[in-house]
Amino acid sequence: MTPKKRKSKSKKNLRKTNWKKKASKQAIKALAVAKHVLASYNTAEATTN
């Protein structure tokens, strides 16, 4: 096998930052969903008591 050409640092950094942005967006969404679920659970508890 012949070694592949090296990608430039800037391209690597672009891919990394893009990946990090996507991960950050997903984390924020997951947190929002979790907060919503907890809030709805708490209101359901309050109405049953």
From Swiss-Prot:
Pfam family name, one: Ribosomal_L32p
Key words of the record: Chloroplast, Plastid, Ribonucleoprotein, Ribosomal protein
InterPro entries referenced in this protein's UniProt entry, alphabetically: Ribosomal_bL32
Ranges where the record places region Disordered: 1-23
Entry's transmembrane regions: none
GO molecular function, one term: structural constituent of ribosome
Record GO biological process: translation
Keyword Transmembrane helix appears in the UniProt entry: no
Cellular component aspect of the GO annotation: chloroplast; large ribosomal subunit
Subcellular location: Plastid, Chloroplast
Family annotation (HAMAP family): Ribosomal_bL32
Recorded family membership: Belongs to the bacterial ribosomal protein bL32 family.
Name of the featured protein: Large ribosomal subunit protein bL32c
Gene: rpl32
